[in-house]
Regions:
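Membrane-embedded segments
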Residues: 73, 77-161
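Acidic-and-aromatic substrate-binding clefts and catalytic sites of carbohydrate-active enzymes
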Residues: 102-106, 243-245, 271-278, 392
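C-terminal regions of proteins
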Residues: 277-348
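Membrane/wall-proximal cationic-aromatic binding patches
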Residues: 31-94, 104-114
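Short acidic-hydrophobic catalytic motif
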Residues: 360-382, 386-514
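Active-site segments of SGNH/GDSL-like serine hydrolases
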Residues: 254-275
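Secreted/periplasmic serine-hydrolase-like ester/acetyl group-modifying domain
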Residues: 142-261, 341-357
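N-terminal Lys/Arg-rich, disordered targeting/topogenic segments
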Residues: 1-19
Length: 514
């Protein structure tokens, strides 16, 4: 009887174990599948976009632990101003930019807490733009930003009790939002099934590529822009503007957290046409809490960095404006805060990303045809040439040799105007056609991922019905302009970076963009 009882009890225990294993397996499998769905449905903003928040936050988790001495937080102003690459290359200081579009101080606070799980920064630099009401023409909640902006920052945070706390806080401040949807993203993004694209299935490779330590590289200028910075005397006579309620509450929390952790907190405001009223309010707060405040809208500081609103842009500086602010802060961090240089090989990778982004920007500013062709010697570029009409009469030997150097092989001098020429040359090889006949040529680049098509159809009797088309990844790039029409596709950013016409029927060889 004893053996029978033991056998029966053992059988029951075995059934319980099997049941437990099945339950655990089910939970793990369900969690894995939900995680996959969440990752797939989550909107992606990679290094090849204007505001690359996906790379910003997922790249952060790839950093070596305790490898960052300075953290930057703030809005899009901070994203395109504080350049960790420039600070490292100049001063050897390791830093990371955790800013995002319209970053609420609530989000800044929770991302600072998240960052402190992995890093032990000596200094935190906080952009103060979002301390004040973001705009008058927006339906604002107490987050002082849109839901989309909150999610761009919070979707990238790893699931944890802290993220759940942040989600509940956000939902309390803005009752239109669901706390649970910050952990289970499919609740918010289930409708994206019909809009999924390549980016939704290549997250691992895009994160492996990496960005520029959270910095976004932008170009552009504002010819004729005039900005008169205010003086400290202007601020002394001004009435301080009130901070946005929730923003001040969470500024207090950030200040207290930094003090508790022994971190030096620096307040900043980048060149953005800010007011002396805001300066006075922020400076009063900074002085009351023993914090340094650098407002680059104040005349002496604006002059010190030789900032120029027309050349460097306000609010969202181009990369040259960002370099000016970053050089200044780097000197402050090294000199006044004693942040020492240290070697970090990861900056070699981010330097390559930054250099390539700058090359793309400078390419779009070149107007000399010879200089332009010389700048196309980049292994990431695929060059499309579309010449549907007259193109040959003024092609010089020098220009032709530059085309040969780029890898094109067809002689284009002394070609009758009745000929058409199309070509594509890049990492996937060379394809060319020079013919009097109509053209229909299709192919793909990036290993078959990105399609293109040349189409010249003059079969209709009336010229108005003729077709002159070049499509690259569904973007129409065709034109009937005389000369050589060039489309530059960057395989690194997976995008068209420039389109120009070099009028090789004009001896002056004018270069224009279209």
């Amino acid at each position: 009887m004893t053996h029978k009882r033991l056998f029966t009890e053992g059988s029951k225990m075995g059934k319980h174990v099997k049941y437990a294993i099945k339950c655990v397996t089910f939970v793990l499998l369900t969690g894995f599948l939900v995680g996959m769905v969440n990752t797939c449905l989550k909107p992606k903003y990679y290094y090849n976009q204007m505001w690359p928040s996906t790379n910003t936050y997922l790249d952060f988790y790839n950093l070596d632990k305790n490898s960052v001495d300075v953290l930057f937080l703030g809005s899009s102003h901070a994203m395109c101003t504080f350049n960790p690459q420039i600070i490292y290359d100049t001063y050897g200081i390791t830093s990371y930019n955790l800013a995002s579009e319209q970053q609420s101080l609530v989000v800044s606070y929770y991302w600072l807490r998240e960052a402190l799980k992995y890093q032990t920064p000596k200094v935190v630099v906080l952009d103060t733009y979002m301390l004040y009401k973001f705009g008058a023409n927006y339906v604002y909640n107490d987050m002082n930003c849109s839901e989309g902006s909150v999610r761009k920052a919070m979707d990238g945070m790893r699931p944890s009790p802290l993220k759940w706390e942040a989600a509940r806080t956000i939902a309390q401040i803005d009752p239109t939002q669901s706390a649970l949807s910050y952990l289970f993203l499919n609740i918010r993004y289930h409708a994206r099934w019909s809009n999924l694209n390549e980016d939704d299935f290549t997250e691992s490779s895009m994160i492996e590529h990496g960005g520029v330590k959270g910095f976004t590289t932008t170009g552009g200028t504002a010819p004729g822009a005039v900005f008169t910075p205010f003086t400290t005397a202007d601020a002394a006579d001004a009435e301080a503007e009130s901070m946005f309620g929730t923003s001040q509450i969470y500024l207090d929390k950030i200040t207290a957290l930094c003090a508790d952790k022994g971190i030096r907190l620096i307040l900043t405001n980048i060149p953005c046409d800010s007011s002396p009223e805001r300066y006075k309010a922020t400076k009063t707060y900074a002085d009351a809490h023993g914090l340094p405040y650098y407002d680059f809208n104040e005349a002496s500081l604006y002059s010190t960095i030789a900032y120029d609103a027309a050349e460097n842009l306000l609010s969202h500086p181009n990369y040259l404006g960002a370099e000016k602010v970053s050089h200044y802060l780097g000197a402050v961090l090294a000199g006044e805060y004693g942040i020492a240089a240290r070697a970090d090989a990861s900056y070699d990778k981010s330097r390559a990303v930054y250099t390539h982004a700058v090359a793309n920007i400078t390419l779009t500013q070149i107007t000399d045809p010879c200089e332009y062709l010389n700048s196309l010697q980049n292994s990431a570029y695929t060059i499309f040439i579309f010449a549907p009409k007259a193109f040959s009469s003024c092609i010089s030997e020098g220009l032709m040799n530059q085309l040969f150097t780029l890898g094109f092989s067809t002689e284009l001098r002394e070609i009758p105007d009745s000929y058409h020429y199309c070509a594509v040359n890049g990492p996937d090889g060379l394809t060319e056609q020079l013919t009097m006949e109509d053209i229909s040529l299709s192919g793909s680049i990036r290993g078959g991922v990105t399609p293109y098509r040349f189409l010249i159809d003059t079969s209709v009797m009336v010229p108005e019905g003729h077709t002159f088309s070049l499509t690259v990844d569904s973007t129409e790039c065709g034109t009937q302009a005389p000369g050589l029409n060039l489309v530059v596709y960057d395989s690194d950013t997976k995008s068209i970076v420039d389109r120009v016409n070099i009028n090789t029927t004009d001896p002056a060889l004018p270069l224009t963009r279209y």
